[in-house]
């Protein structure tokens, strides 16, 4: 039974969103895979999740409470330390799953022993006909950005296949435990954003493959956790875009990125926020740049 149905540890974070987490847990009750555990890792919420998340209602669920907010990277790394599974399903609490999700995500691992990570098709919860993610294009070493394949397209079955992809999506990914043991966990220096791409780069450089499984689906309540657009998001996206390039681009490639960012990104972003009167965003943008001068690019994994 263990070989036929390896244990899958579902790891999700909660931060002052007990109701959202409950909706996620309710959706997990429809899973048809027979061998899984759920770990809810609370990031020092001011509201007590124990008041609403009951082991009686969710008997295969364990709740762990951190004394500090460890962020996406640290929180998931912390959750992995408690997980007993052969595979870890790292998934946002602002998602809802479909019943055969795990079975479908395991297929690429069975097809190719070099599989490291498998991601499902991610669709918008608010409009379930629209795709949010169907894979990532390769990171552009000049801009420090990647393109999301299929984003905002109507789902007409055009991505209903298994295919290799450059990047894993942080909202939902199935990872083999032995890959984490060999490559390491998320780089905690990032806290939020770009950590899964840094991790993706290490996994690919180690010779493993990342697959998109278009027959598996997760519905994502886009950015409930930090908001669709706010200064905190602007800060971490800016800071970590530069940090990612510092860690993964060297020599002439890093010089090309620096030139592009200085001559194009900075003036364009500055003008955009000034014209729109969004000065808190502008301050966050420049703080993200400035902090790269004072932090090391090294991050334990």
What are the roles of these predicted feature ranges?
Residues 36-44, 64-66:
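Short beta-strand/loop segment that forms part of the nucleotide-sugar
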Residues 88:
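Short aromatic/hydrophobic "clamp" motif used to bind/position activated sugar donors
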Residues 181, 185-191, 197-219:
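Catalytic donor-sugar/metal-binding loop of nucleotide-sugar-dependent glycosyltransferases
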């Amino acid at each position: 039974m263990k070989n036929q149905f390896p244990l899958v540890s579902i790891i999700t974070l909660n931060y002052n969103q007990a109701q959202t987490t409950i909706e996620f847990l309710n959706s997990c009750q429809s899973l048809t895979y027979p061998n899984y555990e759920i770990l809810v890792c609370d990031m020092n919420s001011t509201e007590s999740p124990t008041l609403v998340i009951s082991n009686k209602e969710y008997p295969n669920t364990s709740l762990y409470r951190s004394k500090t907010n460890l962020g996406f990277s640290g929180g998931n790394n912390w959750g992995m330390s408690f997980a007993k599974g052969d595979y870890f399903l790292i998934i946002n609490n602002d998602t809802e799953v479909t019943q055969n999700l795990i079975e479908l995500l395991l297929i690429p691992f069975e097809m190719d022993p070099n599989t490291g990570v498998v991601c499902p098709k991610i669709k918008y919860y608010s409009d379930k006909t629209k795709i949010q993610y169907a894979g990532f294009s390769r990171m552009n070493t000049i801009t420090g950005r990647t393109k999301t394949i299929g984003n905002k397209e109507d789902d007409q079955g055009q991505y209903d296949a298994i295919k290799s992809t450059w990047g894993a999506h942080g909202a939902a990914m199935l990872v083999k435990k032995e890959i984490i043991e060999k490559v390491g966990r998320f780089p905690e220096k990032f806290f939020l954003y770009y950590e899964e791409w840094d991790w993706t780069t290490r996994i690919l450089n180690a010779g493993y493959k990342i697959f998109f499984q278009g027959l598996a689906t997760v519905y994502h309540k886009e950015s409930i956790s930090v908001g669709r657009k706010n200064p905190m998001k602007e800060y971490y996206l800016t800071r970590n875009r530069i940090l990612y390039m510092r860690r993964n681009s060297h020599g002439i490639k890093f010089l090309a990125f620096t030139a592009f960012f200085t001559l194009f990104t900075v003036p364009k972003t500055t003008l955009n926020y000034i014209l729109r009167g969004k000065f808190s965003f502008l301050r966050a943008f420049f703080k993200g740049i400035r902090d790269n001068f004072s932090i090391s690019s090294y991050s334990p994994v």
